Amino acid sequence: MTCPSYGLRDMFNEWRAGLNSLRERPLLGVTDAPPCKRPGEPYTFPMFRNGGFLRLFPRFLALSFLFCLTLQAPAAHAWGNEGHSMINRLAAKTLPADVPGFLRSEAALKEVEYLGPEPDRWRSPSEPELVAAQAPEHFIDLEPADALGPLPHKRLDFEAKVFAAGERPEKVGLQPWAATEVWERLKAAMRQYRAMAANHEDTRPVEDAILFYAGWLGHYVADGSQPLHTTIQYNGWVGPNPNGYTTGHQIHWQFEGPFVGANIHAPEIEAKMTPAKAIDGDMFDSYVAYLRQTATHVETVYQLEKAGGFSGAGTAESRKFTTERLAAGASMLRDMIYSAWLDSAIPVNDPYAGK
């Protein structure tokens, strides 16, 4: 019996199979191929035969090192878990007193806080269809989006414009539509809450739905307060660069992740929040205006990075700027939740009436 040659791919598959035995559950792509051995010969892994391990050991070390790097590589989560959680909790905490009491309870604050990073938990390669569908909902590159003309209110109308221009919607981003659609879900749930409360029904199930929608909405609103989620300059300057801004691909996570977790705190954010108010007019238009205001700060992020503002403790200017951005997100989220509650009182026609 002739044993096939053994290479790095075989070594990697055996390493995966070893992990499989530890986990005691199957790994996709690992098969139970018969071991390569002669009759009566004790089984040894091929990598240990004929000096194979010594020859492959340098490659084994390199592979192990690369694998460790993949485990440690951070994902691009706007504001990281800490920032998203703080924004959500502060928004719920500062809601006006005329919202239902359950929205301001400590249990609600904990639930909404937990849900702040939730859409970033939907970005695992284990759910590839979900990742592909929802990744564009975290950002919009306003430069190419605006080149197509006024932004339509409906997602599918915008996608049609993008396709007609020979582009792909997932490359441009779908942030304002995602946020507005979740806000409308929240408003619909609040309308149902009003109806159930008026009929003296148990409102706990719809309260759970309201908290979920509020927390889910919070993620996108927080993304919308991060300037690098509104531009083609999202992770290193592209195009003409007369000011010498970084072209590296570290600025996005450096700004919104470790720096926020280490230096920005909830009391400072709350102190910079605006007074609560209802949002007048069309919500989509108001949200796009919010994104455009955020986009005016793109170059400030690069200026602060150039001055070392996101390294270690940063600078007083970078801490102040980041705190203000998080406060803008928390204020907008609070006002959107409050507006959903007020708008949910407006009577609507039953879409199923007469059917």
Labelled PLM ranges:
Residues 7, 18, 29, 40, ...:
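Residue-identity detector for glycine
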